[in-house]
Amino acid sequence: MTRNWLQLFAIAASLMAFALPAQAQTFRAATRGEAVDIVTADDGYLRNLTPADLSIRLQARDGGTPAQLKAQYEAALTPWTEAETARLDAMVARNAEKLAGLSAWLPDEVLFIKGGRGIDGGLPHTRANAIVFGPALPMADAELEQLFYHELFHVLSRRTSPAARDSLYGLIGFERCASVTLPPNLRGRGVSNPDVEDGAFTVEVDGGGEPVDLMPFLTASPERYDPAKPSFPSYFQLVFLNIKRGPRDTCSLVTATGVTSIFSPGAVQGPLFAKVGRNTHYVFHAEETLADNFAYLMTGRSDLPDMWVIDKLRARLALPPG
């Protein structure tokens, strides 16, 4: 090539680089070895399993050990089919420009893992930088993208700093507790969420003239596995704890005589939705509420009852107007 042609080629390549989305991230299916390492990792989730967690996840009345759960998780890993991999690749390609806009928030690589029923009943979730899908992808592409973006928020949230995560949760009024003191019998009934890095957050709502600090808390009911209830999600019972905030943001359950310590969702839904928005009923944790709103943001929803949540989230993530 002549010097002129080389110069023209360089200019054209430069223009193409500006025209294409600057996506640094890789989205791909995990290898078997990567998947095993991720689902059996001794992360905060596996280190903090409760007796209820082990019983219902292992489907064993007497419970078990984290080592047994790791073995169950590993055995439940399933290879992707060519058709499934093609659908995931096509989804990423369709969303390349949007994903490029998130590059500052995401890890360099996001992995896709296919899990069976032995991994938390097949419920999609995340671990580390991986999205763990269930045994089957949603049939409709729109549903797949909604699920993908919901789970991608968890990867984003996990990758960011605690201060940035606090800032995200603060968009809907949640504040961190430096420590939480709960009765052992209550803590032992808790169901851990692998998507949540830190469950210790409260939101202040109107308690009928006085502010009340609420903490969403997922419990197991019953708290031990029952063969008559083989479905993992059928054990979920969400409650809201009445929390007292003390010095240096220490938190504890209110136990004063004549004061309600634990609320049902129905008892607090009005003031709660006034604070966090009514776009989703997924209020197990600020993380899950924001994940749904993030998915709505990324899929272009504009018909939600509280678009202010979407607007705040877009601004915080520095995304362009939809």
Residue positions per predicted region:
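Metalloprotease/metallohydrolase-associated module, dominated by Zn2+-dependent proteases
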Residues: 169-317
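Bacterial N-terminal signal peptides that target proteins for export
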Residues: 1-10
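Bacterial N-terminal signal peptides
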Residues: 9-18
